[in-house]
Structure formats: C-alpha cells, structure tokens
Amino acid sequence: MDVEVIFKEIESLRENMVDTLVGLIRIPAVSPDSGGEGEYDKAQKLLEIIKDWPFDKIERYDAPDPRAKNGVRPNILAYYYGEQREKSPRLWILTHLDVVPPGDLSKWTVTKPFEPVVKDGKVYGRGSEDNGQSLVASLYAVRALMNLGIRPKRTIILAFVSDEETGSKYGLEWLMKEHPELFRKDDLVLVPDGGNEEGTFIEIAEKSILWMKIKVKGKQVHASMPGLGLNAHRVALEYAKTLDDLLHEKYSARDELFDPPESTFEPTMGGNPSDAPNIAPGEHEVVFDCRVLPQYNLDDILNDAQELAGKIGEKYKKEVNGEVLPKIEIEVMQRLDAPAPTPRDSEIVKLLQKAIKEFRGKEPKIGGIGGGTFAAYFRKLGIPAVVWATLDETAHQPNEYAKIDNMVEDAKIMAALALL
C-alpha cells in the first residue's frame, strides 16, 4: 500500500492525538522518589483509551512499590502482530508514563503544569514533550494501521513503562530482571525520548551516568563561636570545588561522537543548610551528576571521590565532644555503566536512516548523548536500540510544550518503520 495513504490517515487523527495528549497530561505521574504517587492513574487512563482498539494482546506488569498509589508501578505492553507474527524481528517503541515534578510554579506563565492548554500549535503542560508527545505518536502510528486494516511487516510492541525519570528500578530495569522472556536478541528498538528540532539526530551511544551524594557531618554551633563546632557547610564547599576541578582535569578526553564531546561533572543539589544566618550548620549535602565518556571507568571516579574525602577530612579534622569530625560519606544514588554503542550498520539504524531520508527529505546524523534513556538497558543485553524524536527540547522546563506538528510527523516515521 502507498505509504501516503497511511500518512493521510495519521493526519486525519490529528485532533484525536491532541485530545489524548491533553487527557494524559492532566494526570500527574510523578515518582514517589520525587514526592508523587506514581503512574497508576495515568496507566489506568491509557488502558481505558486503548481497551477497544484491536491490539492482538495487551499485557500489564505491576512492579511492587509500597510508596506508590495502590502499591504498584504499572508497565504496559501492547502488541500489534505483523504479517509473520514472531518469525521476523519485532519493533519495540518504548515511552514512559512518569514525568518530572513541576518545579517552581511561579515560572509557569502559560498554564499550570497539569492544566494543559493548546496554543499556537503547541500543547503546554508538564510531561507534554517528555514523554507524552512520543507516547501519543506511537499510539496513533499503530491506530492508523488498524483503521486501514494494514498488518505491518513486523510485529509492533508499544511499551509504556514507569520510573524512567528516577532510574527505571520499577520500570524497564524491573521488567528485564523479572520477565526476561519478553525480550529477544533480534528485536529492533526505538526509544523516542531524545533528538533535535529537525528530527535528524539518531542516538546510538550514551555516556555512563553516576549520581553521587556527598554527605558531610560537622557540629552545629552559633556562628559567633565557630571554634566550638565544625562548619559542615565550609567543608562541603571546599570538597565540592576541589572534586569539580579534579574530575574535569583528570577525565578531560573528548569524543566527537557525543554532544557535548567531553565528560560532564555538574554539582546539582545542596541540602541541609542552616535555617538562620547566625547558625554554622552541622550537616551539608552536595549532589554531583556525572555523565562520563565510555572510555572511563566509574570505579576510578568513585575512588577519586573517596580519596579526596579522606584528604579533606584530614585537613579539617578535630574532636568535638569526643567525636572525630568531619565525617564525609559518599552515596551512589544512581549508576549506569555505558554499554557498547549500537552498531551503525544494525538494522534499526539503517531503517530509521532510510525513513528520515525518504519521508523527511533530510540527511540523518548519528551520534551519542549524555545518557539516561532506555536504550542503554537494551544495549546491555546486546539488543540494538536507537533514540530518536523530533523535539524542541523543552523537557523539564517551566512552560514545557509539545509541538503538535512534531507529534504528527513522528507518528508517520514510526508507522513507516513498521512497514519498511
């Protein structure tokens, strides 16, 4: 069948796509790690939307999490069989249900985070671009095929999973650990959770990720009598600055496959400051987000951080009320060692390149990013995966939006992938 017929069908579903996206944005799906209830309500809404669609199979896998609503983090798989059912490689399209917290509400000037509005060809709201746009695009790519009675060349598996934003412990990582039978080495995987405004960037590699929290314990005292205690704030500031300089100097290699081409080490959070200007705090925390080129070993970075803790601790060492201070502890909040990149000549890369060239008339660019997508989990299993979408890159920002044209046009590419 002429692919243009499918594209016209997708265009005819534009308003349905917008309505679906608006409905999903209205439901907060913030992780319990970030103070939310999780994804239960959003998963229920999604199941309600697709219950009468002619999927061949819909499966739900609930990861136990007592902190979440009803004690579970839902993961949904919807299958639309291809012409050869299980005989040919299957195409996975993975999106996530969860969203990041709204942040500073005063900076949301177009609308409130979970009260979506449609304006100037965009849908505003938290989770609109990350990852609602691609979630809805994947749904309606398949819906168009269903409406036309078309079976794709290969089976499509739409995966809607939890916990992407805070580590995937209750999402894809849990699925792979508890249900390895779901995955096959010959699967083709598209993760539409990264890209550029032109829709030409195909990500095949990611940096390693290390989130580490440095906890400094001193002794709180009145700021006018600092000698009676130990100011944890001062110790933490020196430690953070010294570590920042050390990591940038020691791990300074560049790899032009990635953007940016160097490793990044960013102090992102601080905690436990004093609650009055005349208190020298007894505790302080600093968090580093490290995105490290695959050529480096994360153990070396952790060892450097630990060694520096010893040096800084020795510099400020003193006994207060019988206790030797400071105590500097390093906690690994998240760690993901970068797997080998998806080969440039793998089938999913070639198919996506062909679709972009043929149906967008643009030359695709292959590269790597700072990490943090589902693709890394598949690559660790030896399953080729790519990250691609057309994005204005408003994710995690106030006034986040999804451009409707991007959503519709990406649905066309997703449908084409299933047919090529």
Predicted regions and their residues:
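Metal-dependent amide/peptide-bond hydrolase catalytic core
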Residues: M1-V5, S12, D41, G194-G199, ...
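Acidic/His- and Gly-rich active-site-bordering loop/insert found
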Residues: D2-Y124, N147-P152
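Short, solvent-exposed loop/turn segments at the edges of secondary structure
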Residues: R73, T111, K153, K185, ...
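Structural motif
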Residues: P89-W92, K122, I157, D187-V189, ...
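Short beta-strand segments
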Residues: L94-H96, A159-V161, L190-D193, K217, ...
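Glycine/charged-rich beta-loop-alpha catalytic/anionic-binding loops adjacent to active sites
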Residues: P113-G125, K217-G218, R360, D392
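Short, conserved micro-motifs enriched in small and acidic residues
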Residues: G121-V136, G149, G227-H233, Y401-V408
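Acidic/histidine-rich catalytic neighborhood of metal-dependent amide-processing enzymes
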Residues: E129-A205
